[in-house]
Amino acid sequence: MDLTRYDKLRSAIRRTLSPDEAAAADRALEYAAEHTASQVRHDGSPMLDHAAEVARIGLEEIGLGGDSVVAAILHDVVRTASRQDEETFLRLTDEIRDRFGKEVLGMTVSLSHISDIRLKASREQAENFRELIVSYSEDPRVILIKLADRLEVMRRLEIFPREKWRKKSWESLNLYAQIAHKLGLYNIKSELEDIALRYLEPQDYQHIADKLAETESERRAFIARVLEPITQRLDQAGLRYHEPHQVDLLDLEQDAQAARPVRGGI
C-alpha cells in the first residue's frame, strides 16, 4: 500500500511527537497497512484510511500522545483479529505487545471490546452503555480514542449504507455526545450533535441552518460589539482567552420544539 496517502497524519506526527514516538507511529502505519491490505470501507477506500484519520483527530483535535496515536492506528487490526480464531488473535496481540508495548496493546483490546457491544435505541440503554464504556476503559485514553473514532465515522457517514444512518446518528446523539460533554470536549459534542441532527431531522436541520446563514453577518456584528470592551480589558490585563462563536444547532432545535404548541391546545 502507498503510505503517501497518509502524509497529512505523518506531518502532524512529526510536528507534535518526539522522534521516537514518530518512528513508532510510522511502524504502526506499516504494520496496519500489512494487516488490513485486503479490507476496504463502504466507498472502496482502504480501511486504514479510517484508522489514520482517527489517529489524526486524536492527535490534532483532542491532544493525544504517542502511544494513543499508535493505538488508534492499530485499533482495526486488533478488532479484526478478535473476530478470528483464538490462536490468530493471541499471536497478533503478542506481536503488538512486543513491537509497540503493553499500554498500546491494552488500549487496542479495550477498543475492540467496546466495538463488540451492541446498543439498542433507548435512553436507559444509552446510560448503561456509557457506564459500560467507562468500565472497559481503565485507561482514560481509550474513551478519547473512541470519541475520535465516532467523530470520523460521523464525518463520513454518507459512505455507509442508508439503513445505518439513523442508528449511528442516534448513538452519537445519546451516547458519544454526552460522553464528550462530560469530558469537557464541547467542540466534539457540538459537532456530533449537529451531524446527528442533520441525519435524524434533515428538514428541521436545514431550516435552522438556512436561518443562521441569513443572519450570520448581523450576529457576528452584534457579538463583536458586545465583546470589544471585554477583550480590551482582558488584553490590558495580559490574560489569554478564547472567543467561542459556534451555534449549537441541537440546542436551537430543542428550543424550537419546546416552543411549538401542543396539539389539542390547553
Question: What spans do the regions from the language model cover?
Answer:
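Active-site helical microenvironments for divalent-metal-assisted chemistry
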Residues: 1-266
